[in-house]
Amino acid sequence: MHDFLSIHPEVAAALKAGRPVVALESTLISHGLPAPANLETAQAIEAAVRANGAVPATIAVLDGRIRVGLDAEDMQRLAAPGTAKVSRRDLPLVLAKGADGATTVAATMIAADLAGIAVFATGGIGGVHRGVETTGDISADLEELATTSVAVVCAGAKAILDLPRTLEYLETRGVPVVGFGTDAFPAFYHRDSGLPVDGRCDTPEDAARVLNAKWRLGLAGGIVVAVPIPDEAALDAAQAEAAVQQAVAEAATGGVRGKALTPFLLHRLETLTGGASLTANRALLLNNAAVGARIAVAYARLKQETTLPKKPPPSKRPTY
């Protein structure tokens, strides 16, 4: 095991036995959702993973150790004000200080890969921000997807982003974007961005075969499995886009950027939509967790079926 890695006994036992495990990020606790919805949702996500046959492994940094699998007390600790938001660049700094931090998509992928977890469920990936031509703001999640072999089950990229440019970036870096039950890339709060995906999977087994084919071929890097928000929870596309545009304009006027930008935008969206964005966010998180668990189950089964038997020892030649 890696020096900085601490795997919860339940997760370690599942991995050793080849049982399905789903990685979960922790920034939704510290930055993504307000209290008390943050802890309630994190626990509900873990329950959704279990209900669909897999073991949840929420990931964070605590006391300078990457923790793979948390208990309720750990989650409560992450909800404390001032918890750091940890992406790839931040991991060495937080680990070296022995500090705490909640992991983004990128950092969660790194930890999942170190632990041997193939499937990670989250709300939405980061991507190319609107106005990138002046800000240069591109999420580290995209480069992580290009290099780290973990499948990310999500409702597309966060609605605050430039979706066409995000998909172009993923195409350039060779990251397959697969629609789960859809031919269109989801737009987070609503089901159809009007942009096509690279391929479609209609069952967990279909998705598992894509994962298996890519990695058995030796192609490093992740896969985006894009799952539309449940229809009953989706927001009206025009209203959601109007709220996003207003929030982005307010951020630009206020000079909000860097790590503070996404939490600011999500908070403003909650206000501008009268709380509807928070309800939608929770619904898609739970749905993605359930789908991710079913894909993890199918992938674990497929790995067992396709694992080659160990080569028998060479037979001894008779001696005369």
UniProtKB/Swiss-Prot annotation:
One of its GO terms (molecular function) is pseudouridylate synthase activity. It is an enzyme of class 4 (lyase). The keyword S-adenosyl-L-methionine does not apply. One of its GO terms (cellular component) is cytoplasm. It catalyses: D-ribose 5-phosphate + uracil = psi-UMP + H2O. Its cofactor is Mn(2+). Homotrimer. This is Pseudouridine-5'-phosphate glycosidase. The gene is psuG.
